[in-house]
């Protein structure tokens, strides 16, 4: 199925909308949110000078797309290219450089660096930024750390958007989703979640008529089959996803109840 440009834009815009609203309450308890925003919590954007910000999760997803397109373009125009994960690492490093006011490279490859609104310093995950400043990034087999924070998860969204049956198969995209997250988050529970997310995004784009629950469960089963023999955490991730589905379908649980579990 052909995918329109508006579908890609819609995915990234949806991420930007949710991220811009949610980043202000990231890592806060329900009580803390109520103290700041009232008994019903956050009900809209927390605007800065009248605007909702494009924050770090959205930035990282966009830079991942930029890096993958850069690599693909070089392959098509020059007939040579490195593995796709190398371009994800390159674009992630350039994004990290945009998050600090010093030490920016004089030569870069991501045109998004010229978009000031995509380079605002909003990343609070200093450990991830530190990892991206090191000479060697992580891979699933040789992790750079044991971080399980969600900081790098949106790289998998860029990977999922990149899927096309003429250049990659689903197995390769799922692996690339895991590898992209593993660059900065070494915990298997983190990078295996990247495989699940890349699978869901790639399938949603091409078969939007399929029920979301079916696609999510398909992604979980694919992740277990591909990684379960090597990582026991694959089954833990699968259990958490099943819990999320159960909670979402329960008429007796409010979103707040689910958040507090």
Model-flagged regions — what are they?
Residues 1-261:
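Structured, active/binding-site neighborhoods that engage oxygen-rich ligands
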């Amino acid at each position: 199925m052909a995918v329109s440009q508006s579908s890609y834009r819609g995915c990234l815009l949806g991420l930007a909308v949710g991220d811009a609203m949610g980043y202000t309450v990231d890592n806060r308890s329900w009580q803390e949110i109520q103290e700041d925003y009232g008994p019903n919590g956050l009900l809209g954007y927390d605007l800065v000078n009248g605007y909702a910000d494009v924050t770090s999760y959205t930035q990282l997803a966009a830079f991942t797309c930029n890096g993958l397109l850069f690599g693909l373009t070089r392959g098509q125009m020059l007939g040579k290219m490195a593995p796709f994960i190398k371009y994800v690492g390159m674009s992630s490093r350039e994004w990290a450089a945009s998050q600090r006011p010093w030490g920016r490279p004089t030569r870069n490859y991501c045109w998004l660096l010229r978009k000031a609104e995509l380079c605002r310093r909003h990343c609070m995950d200093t450990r991830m930024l530190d990892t991206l400043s090191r000479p060697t990034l992580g891979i699933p087999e040789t992790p750079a750390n044991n971080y399980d924070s969600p900081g790098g998860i949106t790289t998998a969204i860029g990977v999922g958007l990149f899927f096309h049956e003429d250049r990659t198969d689903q197995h390769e995209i799922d692996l690339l989703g895991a590898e992209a997250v593993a660059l900065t988050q070494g915990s298997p529970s983190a990078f295996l979640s990247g495989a699940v997310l890349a699978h869901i995004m790639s399938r949603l784009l091409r078969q939007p008529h399929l029920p979301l629950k079916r696609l999510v469960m398909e992604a979980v089963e694919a992740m277990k089959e591909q990684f379960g023999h090597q990582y026991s955490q694959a089954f833990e991730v699968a259990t958490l996803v099943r819990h999320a589905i159960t909670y979402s379908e329960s008429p007796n649980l409010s979103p707040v109840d689910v958040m507090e579990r």
